[in-house]
């Protein structure tokens, strides 16, 4: 993308990759030092706090959205990043989280797809057989964004959210208890230790996990198309065997919310207040 941008505009771009969990602290430190990058690719959670802190140039972002046309963006992506008279950052992409599961094992055991708490718990009883097969690899490392993403998905599945159309909404005690009881069950069927995206992918790719929750970024890897993260279920890193045995669920339900819910992540380009604004806006 950086090379294509330079070819089109003549503007060179240095891409600085950092770990997702370090994004907040790195941006805050760079802001204090007056050394922010021109543009930051970030999640929704940073849009409004960074705008309020003076890290993001909301006028520049608003000008971009207006020049491209508000109608070319999903209204929800704009409203979630809305500030007075504009937006904090420019929506660029997003994805829907997935329950990734071994469809071959489910079919062999006569199990329904893991579209609900109940279906997952039934599958755990039949498929959890450690250490050769873990029923689930739940996120348990509390300082990883991954755990927040997985937990939010599980909460929404049961119709629990801390916000509603009026703003803050207290958590429903009974529904929240159902969420936590379910999460305990998938943690119990997971390996010991602090787990996040890395372990869940590694164990699933090794054929040692029946279910994980992951983003669509796993799909190319699952098909053996990424050298740095190949499936290890067999000796061929380019094999499509695991992909052929995998099923995907996006809408997931709890007992108090039979219609279920999906969880999505929206990403933004934020132009910083240290940027060469005209170049950054391109």
Predicted segments, located by residue:
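Short helix-initiation/N-cap motifs at beta->coil->alpha
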Residues: 17-26, 45, 117-122, 193-206
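Extracytoplasmic "Venus flytrap"/periplasmic binding protein-like
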Residues: 4-73, 104-115, 210-211, 221, ...
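Periplasmic-binding protein-like
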Residues: 237-269
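Beta->alpha turn/N-cap motifs
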Residues: 41-46, 197, 214-219, 265-267
